[in-house]
Amino acid sequence: MIKVKQLAHVCIFAHDLEATRSFYRDVLGMDTRFNFLRDGEIFGFYLDCGGRSHVEVFQKDAATYSELNQINHFCLEVEDIDAAIAHIKSKGIDVTAKKHACDDTFQAWIRDPNGVKIELFEYTDKSAQFIGGDRIADW
């Protein structure tokens, strides 16, 4: 039997590598761990997501994103969602209002420069992810 330890990384395609790197660094505070090089040129990189988790980014000029993609979004746990929202707004990035979700978490949503949807997530002491129990979806 396989025992999964954790999600290692999520991979996204970028239209503009440096704009994408700047967004994740300046807006979300995610530093580059290393670059992928080919023929002396950077064509991708790994971003530190905390712990042993990462976001992997590769240049792909023709990439498009839509509601039809198999992966809809990825989620980043934050320590303080109110502070995260304030910081993101200070960078001129559109961010949804904080929502208290049916699973007793707080969430807000943004998009990166490539249109990738990112959920920002703060757990509470009552979060279903920790205490279980079915929840009625309100969306």
Residue ranges and their predicted role:
Residues 1-3, 6-15, 35, 45-49, 64-139, ...:
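Vicinal oxygen chelate
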Residues 2, 11-54:
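Core segments of cupin and vicinal oxygen chelate
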Residues 33, 62-63:
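Short beta-turn/strand-loop junction motif enriched in small, turn-promoting residues
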